[in-house]
C-alpha cells in the first residue's frame, strides 16, 4: 500500500494505509473535530477521517466494491434516518461546503445526539426532526435534491422512499 492518497475518480473518498491495512477516509470538512471517535490522519496538511465500515452501511458498501456512488461535491441530498450522524457526517465531507444535506430523523433522543455532535458543527447539514413518512411536513427542504438516501428500518420503507423521491 502506498503512503499517498488514492482518489477514486469522481467519488471523493480516499484509501490510506492504517494499522497495516487499506482503510477508507473522507477529507474532514471540520478539521480537528471527530464525530464517533474515528481516527484522524493528516497528509500534506489535509486532515482525513477514517470511515468505519462497521459503523456505516454506506462505507461497508464501498469496501465491498459499490459501483454506483451518487454523492458528489456540491450535491443536494435528502438523507432519511440520520440516527446519531455517523454516515451523514462523511457524506457532509464529500458534498463539501457548497453542497446541502437535509437530514431527517424522527427519534428525538437520537436526533439530540445528531444535533449536538454533528449538525451544530457542519453548516452544510440542515436537520429536520420529522417522521420520514410525512415528507409534506419538511418545511426546511427548499430545493429539489440530487439524491435521496434511505437509512431507515421500517416495514414500509420502499413506500417511504418513493413518497420522498416524488416530493423532492
Predicted regions and their residues:
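Residue-level signature of catalytic and energy-coupling elements of molecular machines
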Residues: 62, 81, 148
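S-adenosyl-L-methionine
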Residues: 102-145, 149, 153-157
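N-terminal auxiliary segments of SAM/dcSAM-dependent transferases
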Residues: 1-48
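A short glycine-rich, Lys/Arg-flanked "PGG" loop and its adjoining helix->strand segment in the class I
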Residues: 92-96, 160-168
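Conserved class I S-adenosyl-L-methionine
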Residues: 71-85, 101-102
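Conserved SAM-binding loop of SAM-dependent methyltransferases across substrates and taxa
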Residues: 83-97
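Conserved alpha-helix/loop element of class I SAM-dependent methyltransferases that forms part
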Residues: 31, 35-38, 52-76
Amino acid at each position: 500500500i502506498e503512503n499517498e492518497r488514492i482518489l477514486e475518480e469522481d467519488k471523493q473518498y480516499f484509501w490510506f494505509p492504517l494499522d497495516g491495512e487499506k482503510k477508507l477516509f473522507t477529507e474532514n470538512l471540520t478539521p480537528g473535530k471527530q464525530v464517533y471517535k474515528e481516527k484522524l490522519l493528516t497528509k500534506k496538511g489535509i486532515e482525513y477521517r477514517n470511515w468505519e465500515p462497521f459503523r456505516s452501511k454506506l462505507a461497508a458498501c464501498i469496501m465491498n466494491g459499490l459501483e454506483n456512488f451518487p454523492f458528489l461535491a456540491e450535491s443536494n441530498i435528502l438523507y432519511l434516518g440520520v440516527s446519531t450522524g455517523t454516515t451523514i457526517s462523511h457524506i457532509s465531507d464529500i458534498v463539501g461546503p457548497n453542497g446541502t444535506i437535509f437530514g431527517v430523523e424522527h427519534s428525538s433522543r437520537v436526533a439530540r445526539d445528531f444535533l449536538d455532535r454533528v449538525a451544530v458543527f457542519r453548516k452544510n447539514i440542515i436537520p429536520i426532526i420529522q417522521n420520514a413518512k410525512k415528507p409534506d411536513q419538511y418545511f426546511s427542504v427548499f430545493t429539489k435534491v440530487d439524491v435521496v438516501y434511505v437509512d431507515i428500518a421500517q416495514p414500509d420503507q420502499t413506500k417511504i422512499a418513493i413518497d420522498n423521491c416524488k416530493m423532492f
